[in-house]
Regions:
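N-terminal secretory signal peptides that target proteins for export/translocation
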Residues: 1-32
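Bacterial N-terminal signal peptides
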Residues: 34-44
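Acidic, Gly/Ser/Thr-rich repeat motifs that build Ca2+-stabilized beta-propeller blades
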Residues: 49-252, 313-316, 321-329, 389-428, ...
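Blade-edge beta-strand/turn elements of extracellular beta-propeller
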Residues: 59-80, 115-135, 192-216, 267-307, ...
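Acidic/polar, solvent-exposed loop segments in beta-strand-rich repeat domains
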Residues: 250-263
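Repeat-solenoid scaffold signature
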Residues: 297-335
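Extended hydrophobic/aromatic segments used for targeting, binding, or gating
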Residues: 338, 352-355, 419-484
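Loop/turn-rich, solvent-exposed surfaces of beta-rich toroidal or solenoidal domains
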Residues: 357-446
C-alpha cells in the first residue's frame, strides 16, 4: 500500500509537470480539486489492474528522460473560429517549401524559415465538390503526399498531389465496401494536378478520383499517405504510393475486416497512382505487390501489409531502409511495428504482443505466440500514468542526423492525446514491451515540459482556456528537422539543440 501511495503522489507531481493540472498550481479551486481527483482516480484504476496489466511497470518518467530544445516556428490561421486542426507536415524539396494541412480543408505552404504562410489549396471550397466531412475529431482532410516528380517538368508525376479525405458526398459508387455498418460517410483518394508547382496557390483543375471507400462507422477511416523517399527513378519502388487504410472503426473490428484479405480495410495498401490496371481503371496495382499472383485466390492485389487497426503514421529509416508504422490500439496496447511486404501485424487476433479477447481484455498467455505474425518492436500500455484516459500512438520518424545529438539514431514517436513524445534505438530494435522507451521532454527556455504543457501556456497567452489534450503529431523537414504539430493552438514548433532557445 505504501508503494501505491507513493505511485499516486508521483502521478500528481507528473501531472503538474506534463500540464494535466497546470491551472492548479497555487490555486485550490473546484476545477483544481476535480482535476486532481480525476488524476487520482485514473491512477487508482491503473494500480487496481496491475495484476492483469501487460505493462505493470510504467514508462520511466524522470530518470531516463531526454531533454531537447524547442521553439515556435510558424503560426497557421484559425479555421471556423478555432485553432487549425493540423494533421501532417511534409517537406517538398523541389519547391523548397513545407506543407501542412488543416483537417477542415485548407492546405498551407510554409517557407523554410517559417515567416511566410500561404493557403495553397482549400479542399472544402464549394467549386471542388469534395464536401469535406470534418464534423468529428477523426474525420476530415486526413493526409496528403506529393509525387516525387512533382517539380520535374516533362515527367508523368509533374505537378501531382494526392489527398486522402473524408467526404459527406456518398453518391458515387464506392470501390471498396465493408459489407456492414451504417454507411457513415466515404473516404476518397484524390489526385490534383497543378500547372505551376512553384506557384503560391494551386492553379490546376478539379481533382481526379482514384479510390473511394464506403466507411462502415464514423472513426478509423483514414490513415497516412506517403511515397518511399529512399527510392530513386528506375527502381521498381519509385512512384508507388503507400496508403494506411484503417479498419473502419466502431471498436474491436466488429466486421473482422483487418484479417480479411478480400477487404481493403485494416491494411497498408500500395498502388501506382499513374497506372490503370485496377478494377476501376483509375490506378495501378504494382506487379511486385506481395499478394499479386501469389496463389492467394481473391486476395486484393493492392494489399502491402494487413492486420492494422488505425495506421496513422509510417516512415522509412534512411540508414537501414526499415519501414515502421505507429498503429493505434484498442483499449490496452499502443504499438510501433516493422512493416515488410506481406506482413501480418495481427489485429484483431492480436493487440500488440497479446491475444485480443475483447475491447477491454487481452490474454497474457502465449505472448507473441504465432510465428506468422509481425509483432511490435515497442509497445506501451494505455493505462500508463504518463498518459490520458484515451491513448493513440503517432509519429513515427527515425532521426539519423547529428544536429540534436541526444536524438541521434533514435526512432521518435509519440502519444497523440497526451502529447508525450518517446524514443527508442533504431540500431538495436527492441522485441516488444516498453522497457526500451525513453521519454522526451522539451525546454523552451523555462525548463523541461511536455507538448501539452507548452500548448496550455500558449493558450493562456492567447486568452483561451488551456487545452486538456494535445492532439499532437510529428513532422519531418529539410535536413532532418523535427516539427511538432497540434490541433489546439495553431503553432508549429521545431526541435533545436539545447542552448539555442531564448527564454
Amino acid at each position: 500500500m505504501q508503494h501505491r501511495m507513493k505511485d499516486m503522489l508521483q502521478t500528481i507531481r507528473d501531472a503538474v509537470t506534463n500540464g494535466t493540472i497546470v491551472e492548479c498550481q497555487g490555486n485550490l479551486t473546484l476545477v483544481c480539486i476535480t482535476r486532481v481527483m480525476a488524476v487520482l482516480l485514473m491512477t487508482a484504476c491503473t494500480l487496481a489492474q496491475t495484476t492483469d496489466d501487460p505493462f505493470s511497470t510504467p514508462i520511466a518518467a524522470g530518470k531516463r528522460a531526454i531533454e531537447v530544445g524547442i521553439v515556435e516556428f510558424a503560426a497557421i490561421p484559425n479555421s471556423d473560429g478555432q485553432a487549425a486542426r493540423m494533421m501532417l507536415l511534409v517537406d517538398e524539396p523541389g519547391t523548397r517549401r513545407l506543407f501542412v494541412n488543416d483537417m477542415r480543408g485548407p492546405l498551407y505552404s510554409v517557407s523554410y524559415n517559417g515567416t511566410a504562410v500561404t493557403q495553397f489549396l482549400d479542399l472544402s471550397a464549394d467549386h471542388w465538390g469534395v464536401s469535406v466531412q470534418s464534423s468529428r475529431s477523426e474525420r476530415g482532410f486526413q493526409s496528403f503526399a506529393f509525387h516525387p516528380q512533382f517539380n520535374e517538368p516533362g515527367t508523368s508525376g509533374f505537378g501531382k498531389l494526392y489527398t486522402l479525405t473524408d467526404t459527406s458526398n456518398t453518391t458515387p459508387t464506392p470501390d471498396f465496401t465493408p459489407g456492414g455498418g451504417n454507411n457513415s460517410h466515404d473516404t476518397v483518394l484524390l489526385e490534383w494536378t497543378t500547372e505551376h508547382p512553384r506557384a503560391l496557390t494551386y492553379d490546376g483543375g478539379p481533382p481526379r478520383e482514384l479510390i473511394r471507400f464506403e466507411q462502415p462507422f464514423g472513426n478509423h477511416n483514414g490513415g497516412h499517405l506517403a511515397f518511399n523517399p529512399l527510392s530513386s527513378p528506375g527502381e521498381i519502388e519509385f512512384g508507388l504510393l503507400y496508403m494506411g487504410a484503417a479498419d473502419g472503426g466502431s471498436g474491436g473490428d466488429p466486421l473482422d475486416l483487418a484479417q480479411n484479405r478480400r477487404s481493403a480495410f485494416g491494411k497498408i495498401l500500395r498502388i501506382d497512382p499513374l497506372g490503370s490496371n485496377s478494377a476501376n481503371g483509375e490506378y495501378g496495382i504494382p506487379a511486385n505487390n506481395p499478394f499479386v499472383n501469389a496463389g492467394y485466390g481473391d486476395t486484393l492485389g493492392e494489399i502491402y501489409a494487413l492486420g492494422v487497426r488505425n495506421p496513422q503514421r509510417f516512415a522509412w529509416d534512411s540508414t537501414t531502409g526499415n519501414m515502421l508504422v505507429a498503429d493505434i490500439g484498442q483499449n490496452i496496447v499502443e504499438e510501433v511495428s516493422l512493416v515488410t511486404a506481406g506482413a501480418n501485424l495481427g489485429w484483431n487476433d492480436w493487440e500488440g504482443s497479446f491475444a485480443f479477447i475483447s475491447r477491454r481484455e487481452v490474454s497474457l498467455a502465449n505472448q507473441r505466440g504465432d510465428a506468422q505474425m509481425t509483432y511490435p518492436v515497442v509497445e506501451y500500455g494505455q493505462l500508463d500514468p504518463l498518459l490520458q484516459r484515451s491513448s493513440a500512438a503517432t509519429g513515427v520518424y527515425v532521426y539519423r542526423a547529428t544536429t540534436i545529438p541526444q536524438l541521434t539514431n533514435l526512432v521518435l514517436f509519440g502519444d497523440n492525446p497526451s502529447g508525450e513524445v518517446f524514443g527508442f534505438s533504431a540500431d538495436d530494435l527492441p522485441i516488444g514491451g516498453q522497457d526500451a522507451i525513453h521519454r522526451i521532454l522539451f525546454d523552451n527556455g523555462d525548463g523541461p515540459k511536455t507538448v501539452l504543457r507548452l500548448i496550455q501556456e500558449k493558450n493562456i497567452a492567447q486568452g483561451k482556456e488551456p487545452a486538456t489534450r494535445a492532439d499532437m503529431r510529428l513532422g519531418l523537414g529539410p535536413e532532418s528537422q523535427v516539427f511538432v504539430l497540434n490541433k489546439r493552438d495553431g503553432i508549429i514548433r521545431v526541435l533545436v539543440p539545447e542552448g539555442n532557445v531564448s527564454p
